[in-house]
Amino acid sequence: MRELVIPTSCTAIDELLGGGLKEGTILLVYGAAGTGKTTLVLQMALNCSGMGHKALFVDCEGDLRAERIRAISGGEPTAVENLTIARPRDFEEQSTIIDSLEQFASAGLAFVAIDTMTGLYRAELSKGVSPFKLNRELNRQAAVMAEVARDYGLAVALTSQVRAKIGKPGQEAGEVEPVANRILRYWADMVICLRHAGQRGLRMAILEKGPSLSGPGPRATRFFRITEGGIV
C-alpha cells in the first residue's frame, strides 16, 4: 500500500515537507497572527478530505468560518465530504478530543489539525491555573497524539501561538518562539515557522526541524502568498 502524503496546495511549503505531510508524522506550524497558520492546516484538511480520506479539524480558537472554508475549497463538495470540525470550549474538552483520536483513527481518520494547540492552554494560564499542572497535561496530550500517529499512521498538524524569546547573546530583537516551546518541539517531527515578509500578502516559511536537517547551517526557506483562495 502506498504511503499517504497530504499536500498543502502550496508548492513552496510542499517542497519543505518533501512533497507534503506524510502519514505518521507530526508537524508543528507556528508564527505571529496573520502569517497563515490556520489557512495552511485547513488546506491540508480539505485536501485530505478531497482525496477520500477522513480529516478532523479541531478549532480551538472558535473563529473558523464557513465562508473561509468555501473560499479555500472553491465550493467543491468532495473537499468537505470527509471533513469533521470540532470546537472544544476549554482545555479539558481539548483533552477529551485528543484522547478519542485512537478511536477515530481505528475508524479511518487519516489527518487531524489542531488550531491552536496552545490557545486553550494559554487561557487556563491566564486564570491562574498551575503552570506545572498545565504543562504536564499538554505534554500528555502531545504524547497521546505521537502514539496514535505511530500506531495508526495518523498525520497530525498542530499550530501554536507565539511568545517573545527570552533574550540570549546574539539574539535579534523581536524573535519569537512557540508557546510551550520545549514540549511542542520535542514531540513534533517537523517544525515550520511562518513570518511576515515585508510585502503585502507575502509570507516566509522556514523549516526548523525535519528529517532533511542535520547539523548547523541555514534553514531551508520558501516564500508564499496569502490570497482569498488560500495560500499559494
Task: Give the residues covered by each predicted segment.
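Conserved catalytic network of the ASCE P-loop NTPase/AAA+ motor domain
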Residues: 19-21, 47-51, 76-78, 103-107, ...
